[in-house]
């Protein structure tokens, strides 16, 4: 796998686009990097709940009018794919789910995830009915998509 965007750089870019909106960060390195990029009282670090980052963000989005950002990982999302179907059913207009896909379960020993062998999470999300999906692999594209 060729690394085109480092998660830390992407996280810093996302933070630069936000005011004080809540961010829910996946466990492990994603939470660590969010902390180091900019620790804020409204960051929610999800240690100890692998697979639930986007589910927590969904619940927050349904109970608030604020924009809620989920910084999830491919391994975490693969552990709870039902979240995508539920996000489609609930259809929150204030939820943004970003999935960092490094093709591995980094928190449990760097085992390869299904995305390393062809599972396309954008297509899975679309199959669940989520129409507004984007695949980005550079910071410029991430910035453009985030501004939409």
Regions found by a protein language model. Give the residues of each.
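Long, non-catalytic terminal segments
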Residues: 1-6
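Thiamine diphosphate
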Residues: 7-12, 17, 33-148
